[in-house]
Amino acid sequence: MKGISGRETRGLPLGALIPCVDNTGAKMISLIDVKALHTVAKRIPAAGVGDMFIASVKKGTPEMRSKVVYAVVVRQRRPYRRADGTMIEFEDNAAVLVTPDGEVRGSEIKGPVAREAAERWPRIAAISSTIV
């Protein structure tokens, strides 16, 4: 995992239901906690593009349901600014399941992946079909 510079707009708060866009068997996951997030007291934790978070599988195959997993945000609907000044927003929110070390659990990713997530997580960039 590489660090990212600058501020990032976090668009997925605690409890958000996020579609899982890989082929692990999970369809919908709920955000429980964001890893390595340091904020002010009593602020609701939120995740943005490229953040790793802990989630619970809400919909999916019977083997995956109600499991606690790690995931990385690859798309978010809330607009965020890149270093060159452009504003980026996707049509949907999406996440990919990973191991605690950052290895991708699936073998394919459906849809585009944000460049910020691909730069931070090389394993996600390796299996993504489109990087925006």
Swiss-Prot record:
GO biological process: translation
GO terms, molecular function: large ribosomal subunit rRNA binding; structural constituent of ribosome
The protein's assembly and partners: Part of the 50S ribosomal subunit. Forms a cluster with proteins L3 and L24e, part of which may contact the 16S rRNA in 2 intersubunit bridges.
Pfam short name (any one): Ribosomal_L14
Alphabetized HAMAP family for the sequence: Ribosomal_uL14 (MF_01367)
Keywords: Ribonucleoprotein, Ribosomal protein, RNA-binding, rRNA-binding
GO CC aspect terms: cytosolic large ribosomal subunit
Protein name: Large ribosomal subunit protein uL14
Family designation: Belongs to the universal ribosomal protein uL14 family.
Function statement: Binds to 23S rRNA. Forms part of two intersubunit bridges in the 70S ribosome.
Signal sequence extent: none
